[in-house]
């Protein structure tokens, strides 16, 4: 095991329950999944057996963390252990009392999922919610965090689709007005035919943008800084970035994506599902169906241990989990998205290199188009 192969960021799913039903949510594609809350003994086991190397505890997953009755005490426990504590919420349950409790418990960063900045479009995407309510909660959160003698950050997680991509230009203004410190933009996961029609990466996954070096026949285009608000500059940049015939460099930095690479593994992350099962990444947390180019792919959950039977440190250091991380770092998987999407891709049981599940070559996170905070 490499000396730097240590667990640094632990994702905790407090609950699989959610008070919303967003039309593009990954939950819509779940197959035979049980819904429930994390039990106190499961959370306690995670906290008492996690390796000392853990720096950040992130409360998120596929449910709404604030729906768990003990979420404040969970945050307090993680903070008392000297860990940086972050939490991702849809913001609807973040009233003044809950804000005060979370800040008092030691929350270091709050992430809010906001996928539209227009009231009508927000209501279409996030059913049972109103953007005005979330904005009110942000204002109150900012009022309370400004009175603290420590820094608490605010982030926004934005899922971009064809129907809301035009709102990206509004994010800097929204973020400045509402004192947002960081914005994480991810593409949408195609869970059905409708969301498949909303994706903005149909072509980019075919390109070798993540390769270490461009092909000999591919020219390098070096761009200087420009007035990007100028329509002529915008059109020129759009044209360059929409072709795979060259490698584009901006101020000496290559515009690329980290394809065939797993951020979850490379950055030392792990996920604890609400029931105590430990998964290496978000993609392997649930059984689900994805749609891509008129084809369905079955994604199957994969776990390397259960906190009911082992400690988190034992699970992380187990030979099979360590070997999986080695394979993913070397990315010994077939390049599914640069192929014709064969039966192996659809079933997800093996790949064309003979790897058994999990076959990470068919993962959109590894292609650099899906991103989690």
Indicate residue ranges for each PLM-predicted region.
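Flexible mid-to-C-terminal extensions adjoining Fe-S/redox cofactors in radical SAM and related proteins
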Residues: 1-6, 28, 277-278, 282-373
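Conserved alpha-helical substructure of the radical SAM core
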Residues: 1-109, 120, 124-128, 132, ...
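A structure-centric signal for secondary-structure junctions around beta-strands
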Residues: 6-7, 19, 151-153, 266-267, ...
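Residue-level signal for mature regions of secreted extracellular proteins and peptides
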Residues: 11, 15-18, 255, 274, ...
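Radical SAM enzyme [4Fe-4S]-AdoMet core and its adjacent flexible, acidic
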Residues: 13, 33-38, 81-84, 104-279, ...
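A broadly structural signal marking compact, well-ordered functional cores
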Residues: 55, 91, 247, 251-255, ...
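Short, flexible loop/turn elements at secondary-structure junctions
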Residues: 63, 91, 158-160, 340-343
């Amino acid at each position: 095991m490499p000396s730097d192969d240590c667990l640094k960021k632990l994702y905790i799913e407090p609950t699989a329950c959610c008070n919303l039903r967003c039309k593009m949510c990954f939950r819509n594609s779940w197959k035979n999944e049980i819904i429930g809350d994390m039990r106190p003994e499961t959370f306690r086991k995670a906290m008492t057996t996690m390796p000392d190397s853990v720096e950040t505890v992130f409360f998120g997953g596929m449910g709404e963390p604030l729906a768990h009755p003990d979420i404040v005490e969970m945050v307090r426990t993680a903070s008392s252990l000297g860990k940086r504590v972050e939490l991702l919420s849809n913001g609807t349950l973040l009233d003044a009392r809950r804000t005060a409790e979370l800040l008092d418990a030691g929350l270091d960063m709050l992430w809010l999922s906001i996928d539209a900045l227009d009231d009508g479009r927000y209501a279409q995407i996030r059913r049972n919610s109103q953007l005005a309510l979330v904005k009110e909660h942000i204002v109150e959160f900012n009022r309370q965090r400004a009175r603290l003698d420590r820094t608490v950050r605010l982030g926004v997680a934005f899922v971009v689709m064809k129907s809301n991509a035009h709102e990206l230009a509004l994010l800097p203004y929204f973020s400045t007005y509402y004192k947002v410190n960081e914005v994480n933009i991810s593409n949408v996961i195609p869970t059905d035919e409708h969301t498949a029609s909303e994706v903005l990466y149909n072509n980019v996954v075919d390109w070798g943008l993540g390769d270490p070096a461009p092909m000999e026949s591919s020219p390098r285009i070096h761009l200087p800084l420009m007035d990007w608000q100028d329509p002529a500059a915008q059109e020129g940049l759009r044209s360059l970035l929409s072709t795979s015939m060259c490698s584009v460099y901006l101020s000496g930095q290559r515009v690329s994506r980290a394809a065939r690479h797993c951020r979850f593994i490379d950055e030392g992350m792990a996920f604890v599902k609400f029931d105590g099962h430990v998964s290496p990444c978000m993609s392997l947390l649930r059984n689900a169906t994805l749609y891509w180019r008129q084809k369905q792919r079955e994604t199957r959950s994969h776990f390397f241990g259960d906190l009911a039977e082992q400690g988190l440190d034992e699970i992380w250091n187990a030979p099979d989990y360590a070997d999986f991380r080695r394979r993913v770092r070397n990315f010994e998987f077939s390049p599914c998205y640069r192929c014709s999407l064969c039966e192996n891709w659809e079933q997800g049981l093996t790949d064309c290199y003979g790897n058994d599940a999990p076959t990470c070559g068919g993962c959109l996170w590894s292609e650099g188009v899906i991103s989690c905070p």
